[in-house]
Amino acid sequence: MNNQSAFWKYYRDFNFFNLAFSALSAVFFGISSGLLIFISFGMGVGYLGYNFFRKDEYYLYYNLGFSKSYLIKKVWILNLLFMGPVLLILFLFL
Amino acid sequence: MSRLQVSRVNKSFGKRQILDEVSVSFETGEIIGLFGRNGSGKSTLLKCMLGTLKADSLEIRIDGEEIKPSEVIPRQKIGFLPQETFLPKEMKVRNVIPLIFPEGEDQDKIFYSTGVAAFDGKIVGKLSAGQLKYLELLLLAHMPHPFLLLDEPFSMLEPRYIELVKELLLSLKSSKGLLLTDHYYRDVLEVANRSYVLKKARAYEVESEHDLVTHKYLKINNE
């Protein structure tokens, strides 16, 4: 599981669906809500979107040694790490 | 030499038992053919072996060491070629290769393989069925798995690529063990050391087209 470039490809593809949904939510409910959705409910949207449009590509990652649960957990943790502090700052100072 | 033993595979979907105490064993240097009518459980067996489909029961041993199905993927012991392409369709072949093999030396092995130069500038989604399957097999061939499961590698390929794929499979025998399923039974019988047919959830060893007729996989003998 040393192939980080492959993982980042998954990260981008997965979050494409998540980001699209979260950005739309941000338009209607505000930036903070959009970010909160990105690290929570948006993960489910990313999962469903990836499963619908790119399901067969999971076999690429399986062959590279990444299980589906590992990929999803890592995406979620990274989203929390990247967006969690931004969300915290928004809640504290805005 | 490495040995893969898969035993006591049971799998049911609802009340229908698909696999009943199926066992397969092979080693690097061998090609095993697996036949069966549509819905007989060929792909199910392969997915259970890979760990992406939960079997009701299953034992996997590699060189005598028991491996949990959940460890098969992370330990890269078994590679899998699915029926549908696993490559991102929007990417160019020349970008897919470095994505999978970050090291330049590994990339060169793919780029300089027979026939790749003819399509390395194309987008994956624009490749012919033969080019795509050949590329996927080349990529799998250079991954570290000692065992490969190939789900219909000859399906929909033009004769030129069937021959190319067969050559590649035979060359892979030196380093890997292969289990392949396909309805192109003559091509499978030609490259396989041993073959099985799945019938009524059980696996039976077959050696010839005649045996396939006996097990009612083929209706008539076309010899």
Residue ranges and their predicted role:
Chain B
Residues 4-6, 19-21:
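Conserved structural motif at the start of ABC-family nucleotide-binding domains
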Residues 35-37:
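The feature captures the beta-strand-to-loop junction immediately N-terminal to the Walker
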Residues 50:
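Helix-to-loop junction immediately C-terminal to a conserved catalytic motif
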Residues 65-79:
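ABC ATPase NBD coupling module
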Residues 84, 89-106:
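Q-loop/switch helix immediately C-terminal to the Walker
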Residues 152-153:
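Walker B catalytic motif
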Residues 202-223:
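Conserved beta-strand-loop-alpha-helix hinge in the C-terminal portion
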